[in-house]
Amino acid sequence: MDKQQFLAEYQDVFKEPGKDVFFSPGRINVIGEHTDYNGGHVFPCAISIGTYGVYGPREDTTVAIYSANSAKEEDSKIITFDINDTEPQNAKDEKWVNYFKGMLVYLKQRGFKIDHGFNLYIHGFLPYGSGLSSSASIEMLMGNILKDEFNLDIDEIELVKLGQKTENDFVGLNSGIMDQFAVGMGKENNAIYLDCNTLEYKYLPLELGDYEIIIMSTNKNHSLAGSKYNERVQECEEAVKRLNKKLDINKLGELDSDTFDQYTYLIDDDTLIRRARHAVSENERTKKAIDAMEKGDLEELGRLINASHVSLKYDYEVTGKELDTLAENAWNQPGCLGARMVGGGFAGSAIAIVKKSEAENFKKNVGKIYRDKIGYDASFYDAEVVDGPHKL
């Protein structure tokens, strides 16, 4: 779809021309899962599948939002709120609007002048609950539209922080900053090596040669805010609290494996030990993956990606039958260097690094196994690594 098509869709809904069209990407994370809120390292990139938004200013103080994605539902409607309303939408069919509303609320709280309403038409191509950061894509889309329309003097990293605040405080999910950072700071053909504790980062070319990344969606929805995601955050915080009987740390990402092994006895709970062990070992795997990328050692990268999935399955327990079926059967396919779940888990998506010449057979074989075992189809996506949010 092109810019004119989105403008035409906006006009169909709001009966007047739209002003501008923006795109905000989704993201995948090559490695470093559930490490962001633990103060560790991650290695994500922005992808060409994302969210498009068309907006047009209004003369009153009403914000009116329409989603083409909810148009498939019988109760599709334009949802409205006032720019001075600071409370989350509570109706079940309106909660998705809070990702937009939170950004507006927190920008106004920061003292930015947002003095009129607007209409907003949304068309997302990231399946909701796919683990590809549809929520961060929406937050950064909204932030960049507001920045453009109201000439806000704010840089992208500050918008990223407000995106995380929206997720944490307005929506109620205790996530780290990786998703918003990956989306907001995306750079074409590069992944971002990010220290989530300090926000120090560097771009690394995602040079895979004869290989490509294939996204595999379980087509099973996950709702992180209603899942065990927040429980994992709390378990890691409790592990830190127990380790601090002898140590002085704020996050598990501050530990290496040797130090963790030395003081594991302080945690004194098998479940908490496994949760913390994942956070520490995944952080180390991410650092090793960067070394492998810089040396061009894709086979080592693949091994680390596989080990990440194993840790997420057994120590962190966030995979599930669908994700395990995709990742573990991907491992057995010709030309696959590595595969693992991505995102929060509990369904959603996995990624695989696959030889380009084997890609079609890979999709066919893994797809058949998944359908036979799970009972419905998985979806497979090829995505390019792209820049962050921008105006078309």
Swiss-Prot record:
Any one GO molecular-function label of the UniProt entry: ATP binding
Keywords on record: ATP-binding, Carbohydrate metabolism, Cytoplasm, Galactose metabolism, Kinase, Magnesium, Metal-binding, Nucleotide-binding, Transferase
Task performed by this protein: Catalyzes the transfer of the gamma-phosphate of ATP to D-galactose to form alpha-D-galactose-1-phosphate (Gal-1-P).
Compartment(s) of residence: Cytoplasm
EC number(s) recorded for this UniProt protein: 2.7.1.6
One CC-aspect GO term: cytosol
Domain of life where this protein originates: Bacteria
PROSITE patterns per the UniProt record, alphabetical: GALACTOKINASE, GHMP_KINASES_ATP
Enzyme class (EC, first level): transferase
Classification via Pfam families: GalKase_gal_bdg, GHMP_kinases_C, GHMP_kinases_N
Protein name, UniProt field: Galactokinase
Key word Cytoplasm present: yes
UniProt: ATP binding residues: S67, G129, S130, G131, L132, S133, S134, S135
Pathway in which this enzyme or protein is active: Carbohydrate metabolism; galactose metabolism
Record-linked Gene3D superfamilies: 3.30.230.10, GHMP kinase, C-terminal domain
Residues at the site labelled Transition state stabilizer: R27
Organism: Limosilactobacillus reuteri (strain DSM 20016) (Lactobacillus reuteri)
One of the GO BP terms on file: galactose metabolic process
Active site: D179
Record field: catalytic activity: alpha-D-galactose + ATP = alpha-D-galactose 1-phosphate + ADP + H(+)
Protein residues bound to substrate: E33, H34, T35, D36, Y229
SUPFAM superfamilies in the record: GHMP Kinase, C-terminal domain (SSF55060), Ribosomal protein S5 domain 2-like (SSF54211)
Protein family membership: Belongs to the GHMP kinase family. GalK subfamily.
Cystine bridges: none
